[in-house]
Amino acid sequence: MKGTIFAVALNHRSQLDAWQEAFQQSPIKAPPKTAVWFIKPRNTVIGCGEPIPFPQGENLLSGATVALIVGKTATKVREEDAAEYIAGYALANDVSLPEESFYRPAIKAKCRDGFCPIGETVALSNVDNLTIYTEINGRPADHWNTSDLQRNAAQLLSALSEFATLNPGDAILLGTPQARVEIQPGDRVRVLAEGFPPLENPVVDEREVTTRKSFPTLPHPHGTLFALGLNYADHASELEFKPPEEPLVFLKAPNTLTGDNQTSVRPNNIEYMHYEAELVVVIGKQARNVSEADAMDYVAGYTVCNDYAIRDYLENYYRPNLRVKSRDGLTPMLSTIVPKEAIPDPHNLTLRTFVNGELRQQGTTADLIFSVPFLIAYLSEFMTLNPGDMIATGTPKGLSDVGDEVVVEVEGVGRLVNRIVSEETAK
């Protein structure tokens, strides 16, 4: 695999049945209207035969599934044309901790090291009636059929490409049933399906997995982009949320990034496109189980982004979902990195946003709920951070319209210019 791993939750009918009561939670009080997307970042991806690390004190579930492999660039693909964009399929295992809620992104449950084994790509034309088997230590443990998915492969590719450009090598995990197989250290997990080579991985106590030898991917053009929601108390109050007790972390896909003096598209028929000036922390060396006291040693430097959000698309599932935050070109970012040494205190910087020359947003990183060292320590506790990974630290309180010029700046780090255009102008 060489691309982004997208995955979909709540896509099996058994999940929809199991979560009916939860679907009535405020504020939406409805089941998901669209596919519920998430991302498996590069630290999760391993190949056949590599160990799945077992986190101490946790329950671990094997989620046998199949991955659609994108064969060519796909943007706004119609369902009936989807087959033209599919290079093939691969067996995969969406390893996860149990989830008690789908309200927030499941970073700690889904994005730990080695939590996404993927097998070899096979050039099959259709997997809409495929039985997927799981064996534990050579014995049958579970099976299910893809005909029970809420949305099939073609529908998922069409739905995702509506807002996110897919590139060759990107993958889409098609989902898992509600009931999955519990696994323990010492187990060998084998995923099988007709027409595919088996995908087999040992489960190993994470303390025995010292270093990741390799990723079965080509070098990434940039690292994983983590982003923070509600990390300024005034922004949380503006959105009528209590400040979180634990960081609200979500992931942004590579398609969302654009540069300085570029344009971002405001979708038609929406009301709430928010601009969000953010300080971005760039990781300089591999970090795993880093203490808060040592965390700044792993920072290479800083840059600036504008983390636009289309809040019209918020639902109750993995808020803020990919339709809100990972649309094409929705995250302008400066390409230059200011070295850590040039910023003595990243927690004493002024952030400003100007719209058409008018100051609309101003805040200070002194008001961060979770500091830079805390965020690095928090993330590295359950996943490996790699050089080039980035953490967008959140935004103070502060809508943008077609034709607006939006300038965001972070004191001492940089100034980023972006213009908002309509869907018609962008064509």
Swiss-Prot record:
GO terms for biological process: 4-hydroxyphenylacetate catabolic process. Gene3D superfamilies: Fumarylacetoacetase-like, C-terminal domain (3.90.850.10). A divalent metal cation binds at E276, E278, D307. Keywords: Aromatic hydrocarbons catabolism, Calcium, Isomerase, Lyase, Magnesium, Metal-binding, Multifunctional enzyme, Repeat. Approximate repeats lie at residues 1-202, 203-405. The keyword Calcium applies. Pathway: Aromatic compound metabolism; 4-hydroxyphenylacetate degradation; pyruvate and succinate semialdehyde from 4-hydroxyphenylacetate: step 4/7; Aromatic compound metabolism; 4-hydroxyphenylacetate degradation; pyruvate and succinate semialdehyde from 4-hydroxyphenylacetate: step 5/7. It comes from the Bacteria. Its EC number is 5.3.3.10, 4.1.1.68. GO terms for molecular function: 5-carboxymethyl-2-hydroxymuconate delta-isomerase activity; 5-oxopent-3-ene-1,2,5-tricarboxylate decarboxylase activity; metal ion binding. It catalyses: (2E,4Z)-5-hydroxypenta-2,4-diene-1,2,5-tricarboxylate = (3E,5R)-5-carboxy-2-oxohept-3-enedioate; (3E,5R)-5-carboxy-2-oxohept-3-enedioate + H(+) = (4Z)-2-oxohept-4-enedioate + CO2. Pfam families: FAA_hydrolase. NCBIfam families: HpaG-C-term (TIGR02303), HpaG-N-term (TIGR02305), PRK15203.1 (NF011750). Decarboxylates OPET (5-oxo-pent-3-ene-1,2,5-tricarboxylic acid) into HHDD (2-hydroxy-hept-2,4-diene-1,7-dioate) and isomerizes it to OHED (2-oxo-hept-3-ene-1,7-dioate). Belongs to the FAH family. Monomer. This is Homoprotocatechuate catabolism bifunctional isomerase/decarboxylase. The gene is hpcE.
